[in-house]
Amino acid sequence: MLSANMLRRMHHGVAVTRMLLVSNGKVQVKKSALYPVMAKLARTYATKNYPAHTVINMPALSPTMTTGNIGAFQKKIGDKIEPGDVLCEIETDKAQIDFEQQDEGYLAKILIETGTKDVPVGKPLAVTVENEGDVAAMADFTIEDSSAKEPSAKSGEEKSAPSSEKQSKETSSPSNVSGEERGDRVFASPLARKLAEEKDLDLSQIRGSGPNGRIIKVDIENFKPVVAPKPSNEAAAKATTPAASAADAAAPGDYEDLPLSNMRKIIASRLAESKNMNPHYYVTVSVNMEKIIRLRAALNAMADGRYKLSVNDLVIKATTAALRQVPEVNAAWMGDFIRQYKNVDISMAVATPSGLITPVIRNTHALGLAEISTLAKDYGQRARNNKLKPEEYQGGTFTISNLGMFPVDQFTAIINPPQACILAVGTTVDTVVPDSTSEKGFKVAPIMKCTLSSDHRVVDGAMAARFTTALKKILENPLEIML
């Protein structure tokens, strides 16, 4: 009786697959679940006597990703694949990402064509073989021949109901993933493991944002154990009825239905949840920008081409200084406790053709203006080109949304959960203000309005007032930024 155990080694987050060959030629395959960022690879000998091959599945490239759109394949059938080669482009809910491979081989079959939308995480995308001579033998291979089980929309209903405690953990956050989906082995930094142990958290329920899906400190800090209850079917039906009626009443040719991108779907879901669940309130302050504008001009004049500061760069730096003075605002709602951050990581709202994304400038309290300016320009450009890496837009402790480039005097923004606050920055408007030093008793000054949206569960009105007062003082006396 022929039997052998084959064990693929764990390599940078690639899932482990065990195979057992038995005498009748059949194969039993036991797969561990997809580890974040990397694809699930399943080595198998299928029942149709295909040669040894590897099935490459749709990876989870961000904590909130459940489906992805397939862009252009960078390899053709028969091409050799080296570690680090890009197989194809995948549009996630946040960006367009190059899907790199970790093992060498030859591309033998493409199962999902370029342009396919809403491909579920875990669905087979392609097949590779180790030997070039085996490529032709895979020509008739189909998804049904794959050992990887296709995800089903009803899979959650078909499984036995978990205990209420486990179910709560599994559905508590977009960054959660069940142990069954994740596999037995979890990659985490020593500090992350220590923090998880202190907080009594199950690492298998946390999706990592570090290199190749590794769980790092920020993942532990951002893990949310509580989620909003889903609306009842009756409530959902009532909510959708007016929209359906309006659509039915519209005359043909009066409108165009635009498909939703993955990013737009996630924006709709997260912001609706934030607005419905987080008790928002707003505090607005008017800032005289005379001195900050003069400081910007002076610094740019002496830059000698090394940098070019924008008003937004100075706003980021001033906001950072204000957060250090009022740290209660640099916080997050974590369900049964409030997390107050010691570091300042500014999420910067950037408009892209696909929707809004918030790249994170980390540790702005330790960066100079030139460094902030360089990072802001780089992240902004790559965000608009869908070239951000997942770790560059995940996390953040405080968000700034600046519409100062438009003629928008003032606006309010929706909080980016789990953060407690977001600052909405308007344009600078020449405004008549009192001036005791002028014979006329007034002057015209460039005034900018900033509105802080706060989660009242975390930040009380007095805290918001102290923060906006500190921000106003720093912007109107910008030498404080240098301290």
UniProtKB/Swiss-Prot annotation:
The keyword Acyltransferase applies. It is an enzyme of class 2 (transferase). It is found in: Mitochondrion matrix. GO terms for molecular function: dihydrolipoyllysine-residue acetyltransferase activity. Residues 161-178 have a biased composition (Polar residues). Keywords: Acyltransferase, Lipoyl, Mitochondrion, Transferase, Transit peptide. Pfam families: 2-oxoacid_dh (PF00198), Biotin_lipoyl (PF00364), E3_binding (PF02817). Its cofactor is (R)-lipoate. It comes from the Eukaryota. Residues 53-129 form the Lipoyl-binding domain. The modification N6-lipoyllysine is found at residue 94. Its EC number is 2.3.1.12. The pyruvate dehydrogenase complex catalyzes the overall conversion of pyruvate to acetyl-CoA and CO(2). It contains multiple copies of three enzymatic components: pyruvate dehydrogenase (E1), dihydrolipoamide acetyltransferase (E2) and lipoamide dehydrogenase (E3). This is Dihydrolipoyllysine-residue acetyltransferase component of pyruvate dehydrogenase complex, mitochondrial. The gene is lat1.
